[in-house]
Amino acid sequence: MLADIIRAIILGVVEGVTEFLPVSSTGHLLLAERFFNLGEGPFWKSFAVLIQLGAILAILALYFSKLWNIARGMFSDPAAQRFVIGVLVAFLPAAVIGAASGGLIKEYLFNPWVVCFTLILGGGILLWVDQLELKPVHHEATEFPLPMYLIIGFAQCIAMFPGVSRSGATIVGAMLLGADRRAAAEFSFFLAIPTMLGAFVYDLYKSRADMTMDHGLIVAVGFAVSFITAIIVVKTFLTYVTRHGFALFAWWRVIVGTLGLIALALGR
């Protein structure tokens, strides 16, 4: 039991740290499973899905005031209505494409080789975008034009490939369309709520047979660690990227991907 709790803590930290950073939480969890045997077996695969709820609730807690004001204004405030429609429009491509091809992607592409290559490629793209002399024209995530929300939604679909990073794809898409770093990151967080919640419910339903009440304590520990870690990371991340950009995360991706390829080539 103690070993399982320690494993739950480690995976909770990995989820909480990487879910909202542009480094790919799925990619890191797959590599942790491959090289450190941290996620093997049906239960631990289901566990990785369950602790995503902790990260989702972290965003709800951090942005509760803003989200509550939007919810209250849904039937009377045109700006709130427009933002809700924008989030739904951005969510739609992932919902449709994910339902149609998610199973095939998981079957054929969820392997360490793909993760390592996409980590490196995504790191290179993130470095390139970060060094562009972009002139942001959108400074509030709640005020993007509707077509911009849709394009960001299609950018999110690229992250169905493991190692790409959902937050990385949406942040890059938003910045190329004129958002500043903070607004791009914040919209990525808002879009994560329906996207991750939908994936959570779908995967939870599919893996329901692997969960029992005996796992309650382990799941609770991982959930709590994921929640607390995500809150700390999101608050720190926004301050950091506003001042320094994304180069640190880009180089992290390149280093992890390269080390992973070396380990795989050596038969590890």
Swiss-Prot record:
Major place of residence: membrane
Keywords: Antibiotic resistance, Cell inner membrane, Cell membrane, Cell shape, Cell wall biogenesis/degradation, Hydrolase, Membrane, Peptidoglycan synthesis, Transmembrane, Transmembrane helix
GO biological process: cell wall organization; peptidoglycan biosynthetic process; regulation of cell shape; response to antibiotic
Transmembrane segments: 47-67, 85-105, 109-129, 144-164, 184-204, 217-237, 246-266
EC number: 3.6.1.27
Keyword tRNA processing: no
Catalysed reaction equations from the record: di-trans,octa-cis-undecaprenyl diphosphate + H2O = di-trans,octa-cis-undecaprenyl phosphate + phosphate + H(+)
Membrane listed as a keyword: yes
Cellular component terms (Gene Ontology): plasma membrane
Cell compartments where the protein resides: Cell inner membrane
UniProt-listed InterPro entries: UppP (IPR003824)
Membrane association type: Multi-pass membrane protein
GO MF entry, a single one: undecaprenyl-diphosphatase activity
Function: Catalyzes the dephosphorylation of undecaprenyl diphosphate (UPP). Confers resistance to bacitracin.
The family this protein is said to belong to: Belongs to the UppP family.
Extra remark beyond the main annotation: Bacitracin is thought to be involved in the inhibition of peptidoglycan synthesis by sequestering undecaprenyl diphosphate, thereby reducing the pool of lipid carrier available.
NCBIfam families documented for this protein: PRK00281.1-2, PRK00281.1-4, undec_PP_bacA
Full protein name: Undecaprenyl-diphosphatase
Originating species: Rhodopseudomonas palustris (strain BisA53)
